Amino acid sequence: METLTKPTDTRLRRFTETGTVYPILFMISITHLLNDMMQSVIPAVYPLLKEKFGFTFAQIGIITLVFQMTSSLLQPFIGLYADRHPRPYSLAAGMCFTLLGLFTLSVAPGFVPILLAVGLIGCGSSVFHPESSRVAQLASGGRKGLAQSIFQVGGNAGGAMGPLLAALVVIPFGQASIGWFALAAILAILIL
């Protein structure tokens, strides 16, 4: 049984009883695109990090482990909390973690700061996904499959765009250019 505890949830529920709220679905899909695009930059810049810092494949694996642990294993716990205490502003808060992580990654001087950076990006994703899924479901107007599909298209498109943008921006211009991806986080915060 779903309980709505926040006035914003009640207003959204009333609004969605009349049908699917496409503007909200498209907004949440666009922010999902931006979120997953920023995440997918991380593995795309592994060759740059390996070359610049002389990392071993084990160190690259540890970077991946930290990112995956924070971006995926935290999600169920955050989702459980979000179900009990809906906080739509947590979407923007998650993007702030990602923003901070991208800036940190763009200036990180070595292995430990890079671990911190990818951990922050992963935490941002863990905070974003459960609440954004909940918002997509609330905006579905009962068309949950359609709503989830629109939401997922954004994430998949973003995951495909990130490596391409990394190849066009980061590889030619270096580690500092990762900071430009923070603009995507700022845009997502403004949309949210």
Task: Report each predicted region and the residues it spans.
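Extracytoplasmic
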Residues: 27-47, 55-57, 78
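Cytosolic juxtamembrane N-terminal segment immediately preceding the first transmembrane helix
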Residues: 2-31, 35
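Conserved MFS/SLC helix-loop-helix module at the cytosolic interface between two early adjacent transmembrane helices
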Residues: 73-112
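Cytoplasmic helix-loop-helix junction between adjacent transmembrane helices
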Residues: 117-154
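Residue-level signature of mid-helix packing/kink "hotspots" within the transmembrane helices
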Residues: 40, 68-76, 159-160
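Short hydrophobic/alpha-helical segments at membrane-entry points of transmembrane helices
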Residues: 28, 112-118
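Helix-loop-helix hairpin linking two adjacent transmembrane segments in secondary transporters
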Residues: 151-192
